[in-house]
């Protein structure tokens, strides 16, 4: 691997309540987010042969408050409204998502426990953190899409992308970029370095809340992040998004320019939030979740709850999700191999 990441000692005293797509920490369980339930509460007629026999655990490889967690809670809220079934979010963050992944892989394949997240299981495998990828699971449907994470800088230090690149070229290997080995953003940062022709000092700054703390205190120069976690800092004039590895800009992230539009040829996979079940889960169980996710996303209130985050409603069947996972795995593997 290009370099070993060194832990960054965080000294800032402010406390923030955010979390990223991945993170580190202990497992916690929490109920679905509150709020008005669908008007069809408990009244959805499911045609599947199988149905949950009790409370369903949605295992999230991240702490509470980030994009993965909030979209999982949105599903839990509206799925309960449709079916009357309790869905609880279990935050099991740590070790680049492998804590949550292993928890699900060791669970019974009875449909009562599943992993919810994006391509983190693939990145952890490519980085050598785990010896399995998406193929160790039975894929379920996909519920939402978050555009690929943008790269953010402290507005007091850098005005825009050009200012950051100039500073990085003037001090090779000295500007600090936050990521975590095996995290979704790890290869994103490495690919950005290559595309921009710069050399950064990669540091493990912990979870998204830790990264934000380090950014605000001036301990790091660059951090990746989901737009929903950084939006308030952009609006406050504290952060500048220097770009995101989009094929083209998204309407849902109006303050995030595509690197391609700024002259940097750099595209990276989006975060597509899918359901991962233990191996050999019965097709009847998968059919139930295919149908349920489709019904949830037909609800205008559920759609609005996602776009208000802001995250995009995005439905794929289990079969389509498996094909999408294969594409994402191969894409990130190619990026990793090109950087070796």
Model-derived features with residue positions:
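C-terminal lobe and pocket-closing loops
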Residues: 230-298, 323, 327-330
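Hinge/capping helix and adjacent helix->loop/strand transition within the periplasmic-binding protein
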Residues: 53-54, 106-111, 126-210, 259, ...
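Extracellular/periplasmic bilobal clamshell ligand-binding domains
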Residues: 317-340
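N-terminal (or domain-start) structured segment
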Residues: 34-135, 185, 198-221, 233, ...
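Short, low-complexity disordered leader/linker segments with a strong preference
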Residues: 1-57, 337-340
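Ligand-binding "clamshell"
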Residues: 109-110, 126-139, 198-199, 233-244, ...
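Mature extracytoplasmic/periplasmic domains
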Residues: 294, 298, 302-323
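Ligand-binding pocket segment of bilobal, Venus flytrap-like solute-binding proteins
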Residues: 174, 179-181, 185-256
């Amino acid at each position: 691997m290009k370099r070993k990441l060194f832990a960054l000692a965080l000294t800032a005293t402010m406390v923030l309540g955010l979390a990223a797509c991945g993170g580190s920490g202990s497992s916690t369980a929490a109920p679905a987010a509150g709020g008005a339930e669908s008007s069809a509460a408990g009244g959805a007629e499911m045609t599947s042969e199988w149905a949950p026999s009790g409370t369903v655990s949605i295992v999230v490889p991240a702490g509470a408050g980030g994009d993965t967690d909030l979209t999982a809670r949105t599903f839990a809220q509206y799925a309960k409204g449709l079916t009357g079934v309790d869905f609880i979010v279990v935050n099991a963050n740590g070790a680049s998502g492998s804590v949550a992944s292993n928890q699900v892989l060791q669970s019974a394949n009875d449909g009562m426990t599943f992993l919810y997240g994006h391509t983190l299981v693939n990145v952890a495998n490519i980085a050598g953190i785990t010896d399995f990828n998406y193929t160790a699971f039975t894929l379920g449907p996909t519920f939402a899409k978050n555009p690929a994470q943008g790269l953010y800088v402290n507005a007091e230090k850098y005005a825009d992308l050009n200012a950051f690149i100039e500073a990085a070229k003037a001090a090779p290997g000295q500007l600090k970029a936050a990521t975590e080995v095996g995290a979704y953003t790890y290869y994103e940062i490495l690919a950005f370095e290559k595309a921009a022709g710069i050399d950064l000092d990669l540091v493990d700054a912990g979870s998204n809340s830790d990264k934000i703390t380090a950014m605000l205190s001036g301990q790091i120069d660059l951090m990746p992040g989901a737009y929903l976690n950084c939006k308030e800092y952009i609006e406050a004039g504290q952060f500048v998004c220097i770009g995101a590895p989009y094929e083209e800009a998204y309407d849902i992230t109006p303050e995030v320019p595509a690197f391609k539009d700024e002259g940097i040829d750099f595209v990276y996979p989006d975060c597509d939030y899918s359901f991962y079940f233990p191996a050999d889960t019965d097709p009847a169980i998968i059919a139930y979740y295919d149908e349920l996710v489709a019904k949830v996303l037909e609800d205008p209130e559920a759609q609005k709850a996602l776009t208000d985050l802001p995250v995009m409603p995005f439905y794929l069947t289990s079969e389509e999700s498996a094909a999408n996972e294969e594409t994402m795995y191969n894409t990130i593997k190619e990026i990793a191999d090109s950087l070796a």
